[in-house]
Structure formats: C-alpha cells, structure tokens
Amino acid sequence: MGIWIGERISTEDHPDKTTIIIYPKLEGWKLILLTVWVLGFTFIGIVMIYLLAGGIYNLEVVADNVEDWRDQQLVYLIVFLGFWLYFEFKTVKALLWYRFGREFIRLDRDSLTHKRAILGYGKSVKYFYDNIKSMHPFKSDSTSFGQFFENAYWSLGTDAVIFVHFNKEKSFGRRLDEKTTKLLIRFIEDKVKVLRRKK
C-alpha cells in the first residue's frame, strides 16, 4: 500500500518502479456550476449552428431590407460561433478533466514517464534522468492576467512542477498548492536516488 502526499496525490512502490497518480482538484459546487454552464453553453451553440445552417431563413422578419438584415446576422453568427467553439472546447475539456482526468507519473531506474489522461486516454512522454535538470516549483505571478485566466475554474490550470529537459521547460502537477508541490518534488528526488542505486 502506498502513501498519500496531500489530498490529491497517491503513490505506490513496486520492486523496480514507483507510480504516482495526481487527481484533479475537485470543488463540488464549482463542478456543478461548470456542468450547468457547459450544458447551457452547448445548447446555445446548437441553436446558433441551426440558425447558421439555414434556420435564419425560416424566421419571419419585419424590416425594410430583409436580405441585408439576414446577411448581417450571418456575419454575426459566424463570428459568434468562432468564439463559441474556442470556449466550448476549453470548458468541455476542463469538465472532462475534472470528472475523469488523472496525471500518471512512473519513476523507474532510468526515467520519469508522465501521462495526462482523460478516461485512461493520453500520451505518455518519457524523460531520462540524465537529461532532466532543475526540477522546481512554478513561481506564480498574482498580477498576471494570463495566469489568472489560465487558473479560472473553467480552464485546466497551471502546472506546479517545472523541470528543464534538453533546454525546454516541461511541467506537470496541475493546480497543486505550494506545500504539496514541494513535498512531491522531494518525494520524486528521494525515489529517483533509491531507484538509480538498484541499477
């Protein structure tokens, strides 16, 4: 049986590897609101797609120049649907992440393997220890609009652990608090030392 780091990280030791699972940060009332928002937003998008696909011509319009009015509405619908698609993608992905997402980390004798998965589907990326440099907590900037936007509940959130791999920053640990992040980094460093001695 493994140990827990904070409330969201479970670990399990095996003979030649250690596995870590990071669960999403769940806040019940926010998850309910996000679900309602996604359902409402999806309904609005479906109505707009119907109008774009020809429903606008079935509307009875009282105006002097009906064709100009309909052309203006088509432009509005196309612009609206462009924004709608972007936010629909972001919110549905976030909702699926909160409900079914996990981060899997496997530490073995040679490498750290990281996988972000929703319903078990995701891409695993292997990082060899010899190529990993400077694992440290992400330094947040509370005055950054981009970071505020990224950490809104309807978005996936910022990763808490940063490391350098072949001169590129890589990261994992979505929405971990500072204390848990430091404990996770220490845990990983300690386990890597033990596993590398077993070579």
Regions found by a protein language model. Give the residues of each.
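Alpha-helical transmembrane spans
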Residues: Y23-R102, K182, R186, K198
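Cytosol-/stroma-facing membrane-proximal "stalk/adaptor" domains immediately downstream
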Residues: G173-K199
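Short C-terminal domain-edge/linker segments immediately following a structured domain
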Residues: F43, Y50-G54, M135-F138, S144-G146, ...
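Non-transmembrane, membrane-adjacent beta-strand/coil modules in membrane-associated proteins
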Residues: M1-I5, E12-H14, L26, W97-G101, ...
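A signal for specific C-terminal beta-sheet/loop modules enriched in small/flexible residues
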Residues: L34-I44, G122-P137, L183-V192
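Short, structured motif recognition centered on aromatic/hydrophobic residues
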Residues: I20, W37-L39, I105, G157-F163
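Cytosol/matrix-facing amphipathic helices and coiled-coil assembly/linker segments
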Residues: P15-I21
